[in-house]
């Protein structure tokens, strides 16, 4: 939309009706007039025709839309204008720079009471309820003669929004000179008093100067120390230098969420750190403080009661729920006590229940122990040391020390004989197997690794087996001979017996052959597998005669690397 031809507003037409004759009426624009106006508008946009000018002589941009350039009908504009779109600053000029007089108007003295004036002082500028003077013994209304000054009145009709709220309106900065002069007089009096003190006591100067430094420290409120309802927000914002912000505990964006509005972090920012070592473990504990647990217990009781047919609700009837809960707890305690008394009456043992409360059992004792500087007991009896629940100083199998008194190369043993087998018999002091090798040099260890490995990786020889072809031929020849014997009729009885014997022998030989075949298959499998897998310590039998040899330095180092940290015996001393 572009700026179009100006239309005469309705208000202008109504106002100009009286000036025009009755015969003159506003003419309707013809098609030719609309075409000319359109051509003029296009020419102004193209720059071939001069732009329209407002009442102040400024050009109007032809590209301004019509809904902006056209003034509303109630504005009363006669020609093209943009005045309705610009702020009118001349109307906003007020009396900020003009100093309206304040206080009493001393130029005029009033001696008689006027109607509608203040009944107390006689000023016409305020009423009795707004009078700031003390109540007079004889009010101005009833006094014969008065002396009063009226106050200066500000013309509020010409006061705008800012002037009405200007606290420094009609303030004279020269009045501040009186305050400065008053302070100067006080300082001069202080200097005179100090000079008199110095004359009387010259040594008082040092103590006075030392005291002046901390003279007003107690009167100043340090940040974070004053507790006031109006200042709690500022105190809450303070934080000591050593304190670390919650959102700086863990800079990982996927860690615990920090809510900046409430300044809270519920979850633990470092869940991997143990709770006893963590400085900050989240603020979830606050959710379970106060009456939270009691509220949760009441809610649970309400649900259970509603499930059993009692019409009660925590939010709708809190008082009823509380009374029901108290009654339930009382009946529960009565039932427990009645059950207890019934059991005591039946089985006895009431004297064991008559014990003083736990708070008095360990609160105070008559035992007195006095120690010397070296830690020895001078007076009293020393408290017995806490003993283990396990048997102590029990020596078995001729040992003079307990199991675990000796440790070497990651193994525990007996110190008396340096044995690493727990149920071994003590044979006196001797070096354990592999102890000297562990402390030998790396060169000797490297030299001994190859033959040791070769000896460990020896594969047991398999004895020669009987070929299966011979067994098959023997088994096939036996039934053929038995068939030939059956032909003869005179040997029928002996044939039956011999048949049974042969069948038994044949079954026995087949069982033996199956066992041998199974052994050969197992041995072939072990040959095909890697040699270290055959020597795997985890797959051997518990009571096997396994050849134990001292590990080399490389094996010990590899074992120490793979050993978990919890198995380290020196972990508790770190």
From Swiss-Prot:
**Modified residue Phosphotyrosine is at which positions?**
216
Query: An example Gene Ontology cellular component term from the record?
Result: cytoplasm
Molecular function (GO) terms for this protein are: pre-mRNA 3'-splice site binding; zinc ion binding
Could you say which residue ranges form the zinc fingers (CCHC-type)?
Answer: 116-133
- Show the ranges annotated as biased composition (Basic and acidic residues): 16-45, 87-100, 510-540
Extent of Low complexity compositional bias: 441-456, 470-480
Annotated region described as Disordered, given as residue ranges:
1-64, 78-100, 252-274, 433-574
The UniProt record lists the keyword Iron: no
- The answer on whether this UniProt entry bears the keyword Aminoacyl-tRNA synthetase reads no
Ranges of compositional bias, category Basic residues:
490-509
Keywords, ordered alphabetically: Cytoplasm, Metal-binding, mRNA processing, mRNA splicing, Nucleus, Phosphoprotein, Spliceosome, Zinc, Zinc-finger
Role = Required for pre-mRNA splicing as component of the spliceosome. Participates in the second catalytic step of pre-mRNA splicing, when the free hydroxyl group of exon I attacks the 3'-splice site to generate spliced mRNA and the excised lariat intron. Required for holding exon 1 properly in the spliceosome and for correct AG identification when more than one possible AG exists in 3'-splicing site region. May be involved in the activation of proximal AG. Probably also involved in alternative splicing regulation.
Quaternary state and partners of this protein?
Component of pre-catalytic, catalytic and post-catalytic spliceosomes. Associates with the spliceosome prior to recognition of the 3'-splice site for step II, probably during catalysis of step I.
Q: What is this protein called?
A: Pre-mRNA-splicing factor Slu7
Q: Which organism is this entry from?
A: Drosophila melanogaster (Fruit fly)
């Amino acid at each position: 939309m572009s700026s179009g031809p100006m239309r005469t507003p309705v208000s202008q037409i109504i106002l100009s009706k009286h000036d025009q004759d009755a015969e003159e009426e506003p003419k309707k624009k013809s098609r030719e007039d609309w075409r000319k106006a359109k051509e003029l508008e296009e020419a102004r946009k193209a720059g071939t025709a001069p732009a329209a000018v407002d009442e102040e002589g400024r050009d109007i941009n032809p590209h301004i839309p019509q809904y902006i350039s056209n003034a509303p009908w109630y504005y009363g504009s006669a020609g093209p204008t943009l005045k309705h779109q610009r702020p009118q600053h001349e109307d906003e000029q007020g009396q900020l720079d003009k100093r309206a007089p304040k206080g009493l108007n001393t130029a005029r003295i009033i001696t008689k009471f006027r109607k509608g004036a203040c009944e107390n002082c006689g000023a016409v500028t305020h009423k009795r309820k707004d009078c700031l003077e003390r109540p007079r013994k004889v009010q101005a209304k009833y006094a014969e003669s008065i002396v009063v000054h009226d106050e200066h009145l500000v013309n509020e009709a010409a006061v705008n929004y800012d002037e009405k709220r200007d606290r420094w309106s009609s303030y004279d900065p020269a009045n501040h000179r009186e305050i400065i002069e008053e302070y100067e007089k006080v300082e001069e009096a202080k200097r005179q008093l100090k000079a008199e003190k110095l004359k009387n006591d010259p040594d008082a100067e040092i103590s006075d100067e030392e005291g002046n430094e901390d003279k007003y420290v107690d009167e100043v409120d340090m940040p974070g120390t004053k507790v006031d309802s109006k200042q709690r927000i500022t105190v809450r914002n303070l934080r000591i230098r050593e304190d670390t912000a919650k959102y700086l505990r863990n800079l990982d964006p996927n860690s615990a969420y920090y809510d900046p509005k409430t300044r809270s972090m519920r979850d633990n920012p470092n869940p991997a750190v143990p709770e006893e070592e963590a400085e900050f473990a989240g603020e979830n504990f606050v959710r379970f403080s106060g009456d939270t647990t009691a509220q949760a217990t009441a809610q649970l009781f309400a649900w259970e009661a509603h499930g059993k047919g009692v019409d009660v609700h925590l939010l709708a009837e809190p008082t009823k729920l509380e009374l029901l809960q108290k009654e339930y707890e009382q009946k529960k305690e009565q039932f427990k006590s009645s059950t207890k008394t019934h059991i005591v009456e039946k089985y006895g043992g009431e004297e064991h229940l008559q014990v003083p409360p736990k708070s008095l059992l360990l609160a105070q004792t008559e035992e007195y122990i006095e120690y010397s500087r070296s830690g020895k007991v001078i007076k009293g009896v020393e408290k017995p040391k806490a003993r283990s629940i396990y048997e102590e100083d029990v020596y078995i199998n001729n040992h003079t020390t307990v199991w675990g008194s000796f440790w070497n190369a990651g193994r525990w043993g007996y110190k008396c004989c340096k044995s690493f087998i727990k149920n071994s018999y003590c044979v006196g002091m001797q070096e354990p197997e592999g102890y000297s090798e562990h402390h030998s040099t790396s060169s000797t260890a490297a030299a001994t690794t190859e033959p040791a490995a070769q000896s460990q990786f020896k594969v047991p020889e398999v004895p020669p087996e009987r070929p299966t072809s011979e067994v098959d031929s023997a088994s096939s020849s036996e039934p053929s001979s038995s068939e030939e014997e059956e032909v003869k009729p005179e040997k029928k009885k002996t044939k039956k017996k011999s048949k049974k014997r042969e069948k038994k022998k044949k079954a026995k030989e087949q069982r033996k052959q199956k066992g041998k075949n199974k052994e050969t298959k197992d041995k072939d499998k072990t040959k095909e597998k890697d040699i270290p897998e055959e020597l795997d310590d985890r797959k051997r039998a518990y009571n096997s005669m396994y050849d134990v040899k001292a590990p080399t330095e490389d094996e010990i180092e590899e074992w120490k690397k793979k050993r978990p940290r919890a198995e380290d015996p020196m972990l508790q001393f770190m």
